[in-house]
Amino acid sequence: MAEVEIHTGHHDHSGDTFAQSVGVAVGIIGIILAVVTIGSHRAHNAAVINRTEENDQWSFYQAKKNRQQVLDVGADLARSLTTDESRVQAIVEKYTKQSAHYAEETKEIEKEARLKHEETTREEGRAVRLDIGEGFLELGLVMSSLYFLSKRKFFPAIGFIAAGIGTVLGVMGFLA
């Protein structure tokens, strides 16, 4: 039966402290990448939800405006179909009052829709920063990992710069 050899060193990196440092840095970059990716996904989801709520408000606004228009047309039609104003005065007053009520409601609905639009724009901006940060972190992870194949130190240098940019963009995305 053959004997099993157990190597305690990690291949040819056992004495290479720089490789160990790069390995730890790659792990840290991976953790930061995971956090930024989750933040990016959440920002995109929030933007979609806000956009949906904004669209709902605009649909509600349009429905109220349509009702207002129908009441205005009804009042005009009632006036035009009779020569006796006293017969339609109550109907016209009712329609005019309801139309004014819808006009007031639409102002508030429009205000809410515009606020949702601002929230959507803010979330979309956050998502873009986080997406770009995610891309730089991925680039940093890959470039740093190339050290293990090439033993060239400029790969981790480029990788750390890219990861630094990605981290800054990620932080900006979270703080926005």
Label the predicted regions.
Residues 41, 51-52, 133, 144, ...:
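Surface-exposed loop/turn and secondary-structure junction residues enriched for glycine/proline
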Residues 67, 75, 134-137, 141:
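Hydrophobic side chains within alpha-helical segments
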Residues 125-139, 153-156:
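N-terminal membrane-entry
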Residues 15, 47, 123-125, 144, ...:
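Hydrophobic alpha-helical segments, principally membrane-spanning helices and signal/leader peptides
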Residues 1-43:
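Internal alpha-helical transmembrane segments
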Residues 6, 17, 21, 139-176:
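Juxtamembrane interface at the cytosolic side of transmembrane helices
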Residues 37-127:
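Cytosol/matrix-facing amphipathic helices and coiled-coil assembly/linker segments
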Residues 17, 24, 33, 118, ...:
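Residue-level detector of functional hotspots within protein domains
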